[in-house]
Amino acid sequence: MFTIITGAQFGDEGKGKIVDLLAKDYDVVARFQGGNNAGHTVKVGDEVYKLHLIPSGILLDARVLIGPGVVLNPEVLAEEIEMFEKHGVKVNSEKLGVDAKTSIIMPYHIELDGLREASRETKIGTTKRGIGYAYIDKVARDEIRMAELVDKERFLARLEELAPQKEKEIEAMGGDPRIVRDPELIKRYLELGEQFAAYITDVSREINQALDEGKNVMAEAAQGTHLDVIHGTQKFVTSSSTIAGSACANLGVGPTRVDNVIAIVKAYITRVGEGPLPTELIGELGERIQKAGGEFGTTTGRGRRCGWFDLPLLKKAIALNGYTEISLTKLDVLTGLDPLRSAQVMSIKGKNWTILRNLRKTSRHAALCMKTCQDGKKN
């Protein structure tokens, strides 16, 4: 059985918790996109784990995989492995596999990301972790892959090939180009390459073989549908495709092998950073939901903007992902709120739409038809 799990909103829907609950029934859990710009929190007993790269199934018996659609900061991966091992969770190459084709985030990606965001007249709210620039290099065929990181000669040769252009880019943006060939940073990356050599695998081969053997495989997304680089609220989006279809493309699994696509949906809606949020609650009520729901980013610590449930937004996510099931989270956060409200229809220039159109283009001209529920005092 092959199951894909994605967030149906703007991320932070509770995917980590649901994946962790379901993972006991799966043999393999794979992450298929994003980087350490998104995180999820998993609680086991009294222990709280904040993850940014390693899939949630690491705490159970599943084999966990990081696919080639991910952009990976090897330093962050090393920190997560160290965190687990301090808590007695062994993360060896039998437990974790990283695809050889996975692009790595270099220090110059982080530098370029920060410089670019600082130069924008309108900020897009990037986490400045180099994610976007790593994806730019992937598309431009200027990436450094895990297969090269774990091979000293190939890594140094590839870096030398790319360095002149990266130095020019950083200098042109007012940064210090010496970061590209910094000896201490290069030494550290070579050490990380040695550490991860045993983890290298072919994720597509592993997943297809597992499915052929009748095993259960779960593909886990980061972020949410409406942050998708193509279908999201551009330019306030992430740098990768967050919808279910990209799981097949990024993991190298044919779409006819998909059995279930599960939507993770929060009973209200949140968004981190900039971008449209039609049902946003400004003021005391929004702050109350933010506090009750613990709506602060795992990665950045930034407070999340909160709003009422948005049905047209969800219907668009259903169309984009082809969901077979929906998991509703954080309904308890709304306990005691009276009345509860939700957006049912988006009205644009006198025409009603029950499914979201182009949110960024239409949000300035849209009015929401809200439904009120008086059951907020009930659990």
Curated annotation (Swiss-Prot):
Compartments where located: Cytoplasm
Sequence positions that bind substrate: T298, T299, T300, G301, R302, G303, R304
Catalytic site positions: D12, H40
EC number: 6.3.4.4
Reaction(s) catalysed (UniProt annotation): IMP + L-aspartate + GTP = N(6)-(1,2-dicarboxyethyl)-AMP + GDP + phosphate + 2 H(+)
Entry keywords, A to Z: Cytoplasm, GTP-binding, Ligase, Magnesium, Metal-binding, Nucleotide-binding, Purine biosynthesis
PROSITE patterns: ADENYLOSUCCIN_SYN_1
Residues involved in Mg(2+) binding: D12, G39
UniProt binding sites for GTP: G11, D12, E13, G14, K15, G16, K17, G39, H40, T41, R304, K330, L331, D332
Broad EC category: ligase
Top-rank taxon, per record: Archaea
Keyword Metal-binding annotated: yes
Cytoplasm keyword on record: yes
A single GO cellular-component term on record: cytoplasm
InterPro entries (alphabetical): Adenylosuccin_syn_GTP-bd, Adenylosuccinate_synth_dom1, Adenylosuccinate_synth_dom2, Adenylosuccinate_synth_dom3, Adenylosuccinate_synthetase, P-loop_NTPase
Cofactor(s) annotated in UniProt: Mg(2+)
Gene3D superfamilies per record: Adenylosuccinate Synthetase, subunit A, domain 1, Adenylosuccinate Synthetase, subunit A, domain 2, Adenylosuccinate Synthetase, subunit A, domain 3
Cofactor binding description: Binds 1 Mg(2+) ion per subunit.
GO BP term (any one): 'de novo' AMP biosynthetic process
Residues that, per the record, bind IMP: D12, E13, G14, K15, N37, A38, G39, H40, T127, R141, Q223, T238, R302
Subunit (UniProt): Homodimer.
Function: Plays an important role in the de novo pathway of purine nucleotide biosynthesis. Catalyzes the first committed step in the biosynthesis of AMP from IMP.
Similarity field: Belongs to the adenylosuccinate synthetase family.
Protein name from the UniProt record: Adenylosuccinate synthetase
Organism (species): Methanosarcina mazei (strain ATCC BAA-159 / DSM 3647 / Goe1 / Go1 / JCM 11833 / OCM 88) (Methanosarcina frisia)
